[in-house]
Amino acid sequence: MSQLKLNPYFGEYGGMYVPQILVPALKQLESAFVEAQTDESFQAEFTDLLKNYAGRPTALTLTRNLSPNPMVKIYLKREDLLHGGAHKTNQVLGQALLAKRMGKKEIIAETGAGQHGVATALACALLGLKCKVYMGAKDVARQSPNVFRMRLMGAEVIPVTSGSATLKDACNEAMRDWSGSYEKAHYLLGTAAGPHPFPTIVREFQRIIGEETKKQILEREGRLPDAVIACVGGGSNAIGMFADFIDETNVELIGVEPAGKGIDTHMHGAPLKHGKTGIFFGMKAPLMQDSEGQIEESYSISAGLDFPSVGPQHAHLNAIGRARYESATDDEALEAFQLLARCEGIIPALESAHALAYALRLAKECTKETILVVNLSGRGDKDIFTVSDILNGKEE
């Protein structure tokens, strides 16, 4: 580990817990990333793609009718307006450019809700890279529009039937594939988790979210918000929002994990507040485990939050008290999903609806003028069938 250029740990969390065969690939990736950070032509191409292909900067929208409290302004950072429909596009373009820089011809990715898969497929189509996406068979079934989109853009979608047939199993299969193909392929990890240097790379390619938010809120309000709020699965949209505010100690950072059917039911995906530290997916991080240390299945109505661990920087921010992590249940997220649609004409992703649900809860408790910014990490087109079935009583 001595030859590493960046610190692989955030406090006690993170690291590079991978088979020896993958260490050279991760070191090569780290070197390429460090060089790209100071390469003006790389940064110019990345910025150009974000602006002229993905559509940045995204809007910061003040909600007109949503806030339950006249003293509270709720702003939405509109990552749902990004090409591809979610924040995922930011860092995927960055990593795909990095892969090309390293001379890789193929991209391997995993996806849960399908948003990262779609973002990877569009970046590969744009940049002329071959694309393979691993997706849990359950997620393939519940996210058929995104599966079609990926295939339409030329990606090969591989359903994973092992384990719980969800995101963690797709992660394992993608990592296994990469172990045998890293000389020609880049593993384009979809969240700010996994082995070093992925948590750092993903944060840096997502930090544009918080940078824009800071600039926009200062223009609109002349001050920083009281809190920024984002949903947390692996944690990439949240770390992208938080990164530029970490040193602004007057701004509260609030991550919202999925409480599923309720924290006390074990049917949830809240390892940060209710898990134990373990080794998973190449990193040391909080993990949902049973009493024997076996990984417990996570659960959330939203496929993108259905993950039994969390990125190491979030674990560290929680440990040092810089960020606070709450949770919202399926029912609260569904309520917020419908409320935003009815009040503002915006349909959020179910993932983002968790952050919104907590913001609404917080707004009701505020007793002074307060500005809240919610990262609306994605749009809800992919979730309309799931929500429709639930509201029509077709699912339990």
Swiss-Prot record:
> Which top EC class applies here?
lyase
Pathway per the UniProt entry: Amino-acid biosynthesis; L-tryptophan biosynthesis; L-tryptophan from chorismate: step 5/5
Q: What is catalyzed by this enzyme?
A: (1S,2R)-1-C-(indol-3-yl)glycerol 3-phosphate + L-serine = D-glyceraldehyde 3-phosphate + L-tryptophan + H2O
* GO CC entries: cytoplasm
**Which key words are in the record?**
Amino-acid biosynthesis, Aromatic amino acid biosynthesis, Lyase, Pyridoxal phosphate, Tryptophan biosynthesis
One Pfam family in the UniProt entry: PALP
Which GO biological process annotations does it have? L-tryptophan biosynthetic process
Which cofactors does this protein require?
Answer: pyridoxal 5'-phosphate
The protein's matches in SUPFAM superfamilies, at most eight in alphabetical order, are given as:
Tryptophan synthase beta subunit-like PLP-dependent enzymes (SSF53686)
Q: Which InterPro entries match?
A: Trp_synth_b_CS, Trp_synth_beta, Trp_synth_beta/beta-like, TrpB-like_PALP, TrpB-like_PALP_sf
* Chain positions found as N6-(pyridoxal phosphate)lysine: 88
Which GO MF terms does the UniProt record name?
tryptophan synthase activity
Q: Which Gene3D superfamilies match?
A: 3.40.50.1100
Report the EC code(s) recorded for this entry: 4.2.1.20
Role played: The beta subunit is responsible for the synthesis of L-tryptophan from indole and L-serine.
Task: State the oligomer form and interacting partners.
Answer: Tetramer of two alpha and two beta chains.
Give the family this protein belongs to, as stated in its UniProt record. Answer: Belongs to the TrpB family.
Q: What is this protein called?
A: Tryptophan synthase beta chain
